């Protein structure tokens, strides 16, 4: 199997090191040629032995197959446009852009050149989310009429101050994962109601409690994400309600203690089906635990399969276009969420 020659562009995104680690851990799949545009002092030792290039050198490198773009939400779409124009396969960390129009331009290039393209939405590969989606497709849940999801954490003041650079703050930062889940199950909404606000904690004005209500003719999705929630990580939850069954995923993912291999996470779901005649006023669900899984590896392996021509896009490009518009609307914006004066 021919190795995929790939380069890392930027290291700003929170998942940059983890995704880069996957590339380095699988030399049978990826040949990391080097790095570009790294922020000095950020995880410096992890990239110390990598060859450094400037952008033009990589754009001119005929043998380069792909790039992993981790240059930050307001920058990544512009970097991606350049490499797409050069015909390189693209893995971009979520959500792919802070500007809808620029994102559309990128996807136009990807579509015209038929380039491999992937985004870092981790829940797309979560085994219990995938199970719920399979159950929906099989009709086991009946008609899905509601998705409720929470994805919270306790961030320090520096991170919460950083949120000020984006309209919608946490809705943009982590809420994009939840919006992706909701739109996967329900399609795209007729109306989006932004629900994010600033708690004012520590005197900051950033939108540190994000949220949105996605409204449909006969369904809705309520999504919430907080940067100040005590024990927020452990309370992350996705609930899919259908007329014939409910899937409650909690925890959505948690680390298996003392396991150092890639497959070091588990997800748990409680599944309740009407056909099993569950009691009306008592517990009737059956709890299932996933097999151990890796958070980042499946995304990059699917990307590699795209490059080899073995698989297609995880989601259609038209879905990705509409998803970006929905995320930006949930942030209370029309086209752009980046606020440069707040940097």
Annotate the PLM regions:
Residues 122, 239, 243-318, 339-343:
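C-terminal glycine/acidic-rich active-site capping loop/insertion
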Residues 1-3, 8-9, 36, 66-69, ...:
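C-terminal helix-rich "cap/oligomerization" subdomain common to oxidoreductases
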Residues 86-88, 113-115, 218-219:
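A short helix->loop->beta-strand "cap" motif at the edges of active sites that frequently abuts
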Residues 173, 179-257, 297-309:
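Contiguous beta-strand/loop segments that form the cofactor/metal-binding neighborhood of enzyme cores
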Residues 105-122, 143-147:
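Rossmann-fold dehydrogenase core element
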């Amino acid at each position: 199997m021919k190795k995929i020659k790939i380069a890392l562009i930027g290291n700003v995104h929170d998942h940059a090191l983890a995704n880069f680690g996957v590339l380095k851990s699988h030399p049978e799949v990826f040949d990391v040629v080097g790095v570009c545009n790294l922020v000095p002092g950020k995880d410096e030792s992890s990239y110390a032995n990598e060859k450094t290039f400037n952008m033009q050198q990589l754009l001119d490198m005929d043998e380069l197959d792909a790039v992993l773009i981790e240059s930050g939400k307001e920058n990544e779409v512009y970097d991606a446009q350049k490499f797409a124009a050069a015909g390189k396969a693209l893995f971009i960390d979520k959500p792919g852009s802070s500007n809808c129009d620029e994102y559309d331009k990128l996807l136009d290039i990807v579509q015209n050149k038929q380039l491999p393209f992937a985004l870092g939405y981790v829940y797309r590969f979560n085994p219990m989310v995938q199970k719920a989606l399979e159950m929906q497709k099989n009709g086991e849940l009946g008609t899905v009429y509601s998705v409720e999801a929470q994805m919270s954490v306790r961030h320090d003041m520096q991170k919460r101050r950083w949120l000020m650079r984006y309209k919608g703050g946490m809705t943009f930062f982590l809420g994009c994962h939840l919006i992706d889940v909701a739109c996967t199950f329900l399609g795209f909404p007729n109306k989006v109601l932004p629900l994010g606000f600033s708690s004012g904690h520590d005197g900051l004005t950033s939108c540190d409690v994000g949220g949105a209500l996605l409204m449909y003719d006969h369904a809705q999705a309520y999504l919430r994400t907080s940067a100040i929630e005590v024990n927020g990580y452990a309370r992350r939850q996705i609930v899919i309600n259908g007329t014939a069954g409910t899937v409650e995923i909690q925890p959505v993912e948690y680390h298996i203690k003392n396991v150092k291999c890639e497959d070091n996470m588990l997800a748990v779901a409680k599944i309740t089906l009407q056909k099993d005649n569950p009691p009306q006023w008592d517990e009737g669900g059956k709890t299932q635990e996933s097999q151990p899984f890796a958070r980042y590896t499946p995304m990059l392996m699917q990307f590699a399969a795209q490059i080899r021509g073995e698989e297609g896009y995880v989601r259609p490009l038209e879905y990705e276009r509409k998803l970006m518009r929905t995320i930006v609307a949930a942030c209370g914006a029309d086209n752009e969420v980046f606020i440069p004066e707040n940097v």
